């Protein structure tokens, strides 16, 4: 082909490509009934978006919609907590991306109350529900099934030995006289439903008694004696005719739902595929739709609670890291699981082992050694970071881990409790000799600099800083919190120069000094990781960063002593002298490194072992036993030592730990951390750019 013709053809094709409009973005909403599909078609016409088009996919049930989204034949649906649980599991693998807000635009409320509504003319109490006629929103739904059935089991009013004996539906059908539970397979649970032919007992609006309004209509029509719905279901003009049935066997007015409810539960949420980025388009479309006056997301001429609940005032985007488990919360998630799988005898028995979460290969190696000599009392799990360990414990995949105060704050916000604290004071070992002691381990957060440099606490602007990790106490929360308060500036990265703060955005200024794994320089995934795979992570890592690159290092008061004067044989540390380093004091002066009690940034709580509240007792008992064997004064300390690290520093526990002290069961995380430190971390986390993804997920709502 002639060269000029070839060039002309290429240029023509290029021009054609450039002239073609970009591919149109589309959000396909799944409607699970004809009335929902009609509302969806209305929204197509009224919720116009210049960049994103809405289309509607009609299915006959929530399950069909979940399958359609999984198979990329639809993109989104708004469901209740029970379906969030189902959608988050295999094979669907969906995640919540937005939540309905029932509060106001300025004070969002993404929770609601599950209640039991009865007619005022009736007289029975909660404990007298047996043999009553019941109206439910739908099988597997939060207010209409999961909460009430879970509560009946908990109060032992309903007997169920588990799915191996009989189905839960069968057990419930024996408890109530007759019911309407849309979606149920047990005939007696569909007896009171009003749908015609194939629509009778359908888990969609094709069944008149489906959902909140439907369950209440079932009660109104005298097809039931009680309806399990949400706190806002009963119209205000009908409050005079109905009451709430309280679990304490009293009754209260409909308006007193905060003092008479079955549970406070997470809002309905929008589900989307977890594996792709379609979530961005869905969120963008819905945010724009809420600004359009003609776009009526939360009402419809075609019926009640179609696509979204009518009581919602807006849709709130969820933190990107949130999944079904974190959205629902550990307690509710496990309750739903128990309703699906039953409670096994093994779940009720006291654990005979502690599954310890490790955060690096070196920790796993030490833990494996511990497992071998523990007689089965210790097992090990693997995680990449402290936050991954917190998540493992929440999900029941691990039992315990030792955390720094910063991560303890996050753990507490996620529902874990402190059970044993590290104790460091070599000068007073009396507390280690008692089973219970009021003593509490503390250490000091300090700023370390090389002797002879001009840097001080008062002139940190533009200096190179080294941190243990984002979210940790001495290396981040204390220094960054103090600097943020003093400068009234949340943008710490712009205040200092280059930094290594493992856990930061790898492209940011806060990761510039990080080096990853020196043994694998081409593995960019290791750089700035909040784990041992980043050489500058942790106390020793932050100090190494100071030695090799930085101007100031934020660590604990023993860090210099543990890495100088021959204490650390690593190549980078073996020739270092402690006299070559000084402490930076908050008043702008400097002090010798042994003057930490006077010259420090804060006295902070010791690292602590955390676990779930229900596992506190076995974790403490096993650790007390293991400490008596392998602690500093252990009978078998020659075989293994819990508080020493052969192949690294501070593995599983800090090497300076003298013993573990039991923390009183009544001690809250806030009390253990101390009000001053707790308040400092809370203030620091108001800076959105410093708040971790897990913390954002755990604190998104309080239900």
UniProtKB/Swiss-Prot annotation:
Cysteine disulfide partners in this protein: 30-65, 40-56, 135-218, 180-193, 246-260, 357-389, 367-380, 414-698, 432-659, 466-545, 490-687, 500-514, 511-528, 585-599
UniProt entry tagged with the keyword Heme: no
Region of interest (Connecting region), residue spans: 341-350
GO CC, any one term: extracellular space
GO BP field: iron ion transport
Binding-site list for hydrogencarbonate 2: 468, 472, 474-475
SUPFAM superfamilies: Periplasmic binding protein-like II (SSF53850)
Subunit record text: Monomer.
Chain's role: Transferrins are iron binding transport proteins which can bind two Fe(3+) ions in association with the binding of an anion, usually bicarbonate. It is responsible for the transport of iron from sites of absorption and heme degradation to those of storage and utilization. Serum transferrin may also have a further role in stimulating cell proliferation.
UniProt name for this protein: Serotransferrin
């Amino acid at each position: 082909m002639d060269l000029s013709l070839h060039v002309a053809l290429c240029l023509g094709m290029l021009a054609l490509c450039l002239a073609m409009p970009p591919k149109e973005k589309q959000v396909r909403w799944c409607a699970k009934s004809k009335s929902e599909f009609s509302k969806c078609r209305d929204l197509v016409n009224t919720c116009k978006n210049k960049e994103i088009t809405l289309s509607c996919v009609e299915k006959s049930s929530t399950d069909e919609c979940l399958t359609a989204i999984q198979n990329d034949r639809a993109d989104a649906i708004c469901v209740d907590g029970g379906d969030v649980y189902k959608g988050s599991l295999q094979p669907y693998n969906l995640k919540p991306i937005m939540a309905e807000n029932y509060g106001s635009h300025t004070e969002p409320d993404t929770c609601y109350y599950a209640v039991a509504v009865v007619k005022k003319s009736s007289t029975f109490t909660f404990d007298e529900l047996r043999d009553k006629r019941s109206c439910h929103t739908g099988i597997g739904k939060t207010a209409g099934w999961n909460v009430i059935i879970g509560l009946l089991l908990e109060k032992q009013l309903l007997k169920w030995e588990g799915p191996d004996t009989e189905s839960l539906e069968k057990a419930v059908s024996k408890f109530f006289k007759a019911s309407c539970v849309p979606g149920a397979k047990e005939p007696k649970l569909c007896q009171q439903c009003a749908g015609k032919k194939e629509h009778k007992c359908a888990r969609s609006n094709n069944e008149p008694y489906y959902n909140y309004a439907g369950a209440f209509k079932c009660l109104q029509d005298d097809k039931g004696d009680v309806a399990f719905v949400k706190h806002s279901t009963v119209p205000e003009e009908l409050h005079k005719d109905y009451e709430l049935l309280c679990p304490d066997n009293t009754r209260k007015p409909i308006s007193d739902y905060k003092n008479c409810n079955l549970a406070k539960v997470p809002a309905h949420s929008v589900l989307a595929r977890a594996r792709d980025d379609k979530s961005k388009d869905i969120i963008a479309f819905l945010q724009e739709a809420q600004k359009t006056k003609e776009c009526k997301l939360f009402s419809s001429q075609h019926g009640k609670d179609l696509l979204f609940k009518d009581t919602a005032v807006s849709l709130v985007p969820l933190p990107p890291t949130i999944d079904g488990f974190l959205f629902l919360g550990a307690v509710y998630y496990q309750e739903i699981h128990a309703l699906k799988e039953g409670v096994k005898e093994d779940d009720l028995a006291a654990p005979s082992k502690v599954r310890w979460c490790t955060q690096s290969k070196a920790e796993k190696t030490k833990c494996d050694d511990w497992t071998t000599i523990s007689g089965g009392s210790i097992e090990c799990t693997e995680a990449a970071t402290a936050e991954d360990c917190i998540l493992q414990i929440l999900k029941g995949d691990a039992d315990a881990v030792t955390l720094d105060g910063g991560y303890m704050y996050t753990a507490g916000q996620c529902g874990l409790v402190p059970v044993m604290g590290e104790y460091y004071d070599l000068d007073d070992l009396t507390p280690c000799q008692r089973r219970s002691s009021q003593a509490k381990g503390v250490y000091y957060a300090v700023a370390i600099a090389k002797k002879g440099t001009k840097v001080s606490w008062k002139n940190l602007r533009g200096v190179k800083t080294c941190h243990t990790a984002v979210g940790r106490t001495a290396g981040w929360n204390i220094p960054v919190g103090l600097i943020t308060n003093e400068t009234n500036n949340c943008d710490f990265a712009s205040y200092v120069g280059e930094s290594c703060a493992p856990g930061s955005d790898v492209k940011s200024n806060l990761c510039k000094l990080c080096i990853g794994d020196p043994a694998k320089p081409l593995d960019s995934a290791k750089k700035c990781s909040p784990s041992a795979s980043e050489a500058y992570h942790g106390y020793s890592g932050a100090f190494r960063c100071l030695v090799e690159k930085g101007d100031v290092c934020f660590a604990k008061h023993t860090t210099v002593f543990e890495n100088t004067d021959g204490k650390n044989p690593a190549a980078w540390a073996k020739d270092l002298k402690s006299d070559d380093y000084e402490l930076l004091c908050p008043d702008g002066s400097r002090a010798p490194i042994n003057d930490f009690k006077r010259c420090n940034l804060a006295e902070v709580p010791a690292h602590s072992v955390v676990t779930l509240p229900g596992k506190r007792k076995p974790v403490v008992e096993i650790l007390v036993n293991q400490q008596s064997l392998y602690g500093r004064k252990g009978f078998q300390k020659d075989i293994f030592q819990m508080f020493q690290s052969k192949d690294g520093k501070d593995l599983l526990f800090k090497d300076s730990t003298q013993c573990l002290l039991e923390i009183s069961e009544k001690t809250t995380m806030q009390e253990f951390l101390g009000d001053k430190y707790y308040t400092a971390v809370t203030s620091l986390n108001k800076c959105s750019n410093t708040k971790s993804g897990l913390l954002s997920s755990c604190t998104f709502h309080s239900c």
